[in-house]
Amino acid sequence: MLRNCHFFLLLSTILILLHFGKADIRKDCRRESKVSWAALRRMKAGDLEQEDQNLKCYLKCFMMRHGILDKNAEVDVQRALRHLPRSMQDSSKKLFNKCKSIQNDDPCDKAYSMIKCYVEHHPEILQSVPFL
């Protein structure tokens, strides 16, 4: 019984740290990129025609901190899939492989182009993944 309590306490602590860690990533990336709340809200509403460099760099930061992009702005498909709801993972694998082939010398532009490519086929992702 005591062992179960310790396990539950440890698990609860880990989940709380993960939750706040994700919030810190968003906050840190907003601060680092200087993206406006308005640009983030427009993106969440589906406006992916913005030419906002700060938004693009926010997405790069967000994806790098979550391990989706490496330091060379290359996509780790397996890690990207882990951030999606299970119901979307199978259908997303081919799409991630297609979208990751986008070439761009600027890592911020590349991250934005990959998100745009993905969202064109799965717009519901903007509501499923906590970008804000």
Locate predicted features:
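Compact alpha-helical subdomains of small soluble proteins
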Residues: H83-P123
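Disulfide-stabilized extracellular ectodomain repeats and their linkers
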Residues: R26, Y58, H66, V77, ...
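Short, recurring structural edge motifs at helix starts
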Residues: M43-Q50, C99-D105
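Cleavable N-terminal signal peptides of Sec/SRP-targeted secreted and luminal proteins
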Residues: R3-G21
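Secreted, propeptide-processed cysteine-rich mini-domains
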Residues: K22-L40
